Design a protein with these regions (language model features):
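Active-site pre-lysine segment of PLP-dependent enzymes
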Residues: 2-14, 27-50, 56-89
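A structural signal for well-ordered alpha-helical scaffolds and beta->alpha junctions
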Residues: 1, 5, 65, 103, ...
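Generic recognition of cysteine residues
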Residues: 22, 65-66, 113, 122
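PLP-dependent aminotransferase class I/II
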Residues: 79-128
Protein backbone atom coordinates (compact mmCIF):
# COMPACT_ATOMS: atom_id res chain seq x y z
CA UNK A 1 0.00 0.00 0.00
CA UNK A 2 1.04 3.56 -0.66
CA UNK A 3 1.63 6.02 2.16
CA UNK A 4 -1.68 7.78 2.73
CA UNK A 5 -1.21 10.86 4.95
CA UNK A 6 -4.93 11.77 5.15
CA UNK A 7 -5.87 8.22 6.20
CA UNK A 8 -3.04 8.12 8.72
CA UNK A 9 -4.01 11.54 10.10
CA UNK A 10 -7.59 10.34 10.43
CA UNK A 11 -6.46 7.55 12.78
CA UNK A 12 -4.66 9.95 15.14
CA UNK A 13 -6.85 10.58 18.15
CA UNK A 14 -6.56 12.08 21.63
CA UNK A 15 -4.92 8.91 22.94
CA UNK A 16 -2.30 8.76 20.17
CA UNK A 17 1.18 9.42 21.55
CA UNK A 18 3.47 7.97 18.86
CA UNK A 19 3.37 7.60 15.08
CA UNK A 20 5.96 5.22 13.61
CA UNK A 21 6.93 5.29 9.94
CA UNK A 22 9.43 2.87 8.40
CA UNK A 23 11.14 4.53 5.47
CA UNK A 24 12.19 2.87 3.28
CA UNK A 25 9.86 0.05 4.11
CA UNK A 26 10.96 -3.48 4.83
CA UNK A 27 10.35 -5.90 3.12
CA UNK A 28 8.80 -4.11 0.13
CA UNK A 29 11.49 -1.49 -0.43
CA UNK A 30 8.87 1.15 -1.07
CA UNK A 31 9.54 4.60 0.31
CA UNK A 32 7.82 7.88 1.06
CA UNK A 33 9.34 10.88 -0.72
CA UNK A 34 10.87 13.40 1.67
CA UNK A 35 8.42 16.13 0.66
CA UNK A 36 5.44 13.98 1.66
CA UNK A 37 7.06 13.07 4.98
CA UNK A 38 7.84 16.70 5.81
CA UNK A 39 4.31 17.80 4.91
CA UNK A 40 2.88 15.01 7.09
CA UNK A 41 5.17 15.91 10.00
CA UNK A 42 4.00 19.52 9.76
CA UNK A 43 0.41 18.41 10.45
CA UNK A 44 1.06 16.29 13.55
CA UNK A 45 -0.14 17.55 16.93
CA UNK A 46 2.64 18.89 19.18
CA UNK A 47 2.16 16.09 21.71
CA UNK A 48 2.56 13.24 19.19
CA UNK A 49 6.05 11.79 18.78
CA UNK A 50 7.04 10.95 15.21
CA UNK A 51 9.41 7.98 15.14
CA UNK A 52 11.18 7.43 11.84
CA UNK A 53 12.61 3.93 11.47
CA UNK A 54 15.32 4.42 8.85
CA UNK A 55 17.05 1.05 9.24
CA UNK A 56 17.26 0.61 5.47
CA UNK A 57 18.04 4.21 4.46
CA UNK A 58 21.56 3.33 3.28
CA UNK A 59 20.01 1.05 0.65
CA UNK A 60 17.86 3.84 -0.82
CA UNK A 61 18.93 4.96 -4.28
CA UNK A 62 16.15 7.36 -5.23
CA UNK A 63 17.10 11.04 -4.77
CA UNK A 64 13.81 11.87 -3.03
CA UNK A 65 14.18 9.08 -0.46
CA UNK A 66 15.98 11.05 2.22
CA UNK A 67 16.41 10.93 5.95
CA UNK A 68 14.29 13.11 8.22
CA UNK A 69 17.39 14.19 10.17
CA UNK A 70 17.62 17.58 8.41
CA UNK A 71 13.91 18.21 9.03
CA UNK A 72 14.35 17.23 12.68
CA UNK A 73 17.23 19.70 13.06
CA UNK A 74 15.29 22.48 11.32
CA UNK A 75 12.20 21.90 13.50
CA UNK A 76 13.45 21.39 17.07
CA UNK A 77 9.96 22.21 18.35
CA UNK A 78 8.57 19.01 16.79
CA UNK A 79 9.12 15.78 18.74
CA UNK A 80 10.91 13.56 16.22
CA UNK A 81 13.10 10.53 16.82
CA UNK A 82 15.11 9.00 13.96
CA UNK A 83 16.25 5.40 14.41
CA UNK A 84 19.15 4.00 12.41
CA UNK A 85 21.20 0.81 12.52
CA UNK A 86 24.58 -0.51 11.52
CA UNK A 87 23.18 -4.04 11.54
CA UNK A 88 21.58 -4.05 8.08
CA UNK A 89 23.95 -2.16 5.78
CA UNK A 90 27.16 -3.31 7.43
CA UNK A 91 26.04 -6.96 7.74
CA UNK A 92 26.17 -6.91 11.54
CA UNK A 93 22.74 -8.44 12.17
CA UNK A 94 23.90 -10.65 15.03
CA UNK A 95 25.37 -7.68 16.87
CA UNK A 96 22.20 -5.55 16.92
CA UNK A 97 23.97 -2.18 16.85
CA UNK A 98 21.83 0.88 16.29
CA UNK A 99 21.35 4.45 17.37
CA UNK A 100 18.73 7.14 17.82
CA UNK A 101 18.85 10.79 16.84
CA UNK A 102 16.60 13.27 18.59
CA UNK A 103 16.43 16.20 20.93
CA UNK A 104 18.37 16.10 24.19
CA UNK A 105 15.05 15.76 25.99
CA UNK A 106 13.95 12.70 23.97
CA UNK A 107 17.35 11.02 24.22
CA UNK A 108 17.36 11.70 27.97
CA UNK A 109 14.00 9.95 28.33
CA UNK A 110 15.32 6.98 26.36
CA UNK A 111 18.39 6.75 28.60
CA UNK A 112 16.19 6.61 31.69
CA UNK A 113 14.32 3.65 30.20
CA UNK A 114 17.22 1.65 28.78
CA UNK A 115 19.29 -0.93 30.60
CA UNK A 116 22.94 -0.02 31.06
CA UNK A 117 23.98 -3.48 29.87
CA UNK A 118 21.99 -3.54 26.63
CA UNK A 119 25.06 -3.65 24.34
CA UNK A 120 27.80 -6.25 24.62
CA UNK A 121 31.52 -5.53 24.21
CA UNK A 122 31.72 -7.19 20.76
CA UNK A 123 28.95 -4.96 19.44
CA UNK A 124 30.55 -1.87 20.99
CA UNK A 125 33.90 -2.60 19.34
CA UNK A 126 32.26 -3.27 15.96
CA UNK A 127 30.40 0.05 16.16
CA UNK A 128 33.64 1.92 16.80
Amino acid sequence: QKFNPPAMKEKIGEKTKIVVICNPNNPTGTYVPIGELEAFADTLPEDVLLVMDEAYMEFATEPDCCSMVDYMKAHPENPILVLRTFSKYYAMAGLRVGYALGSEELIGIMRKCSASWNLNVCAQKAAE
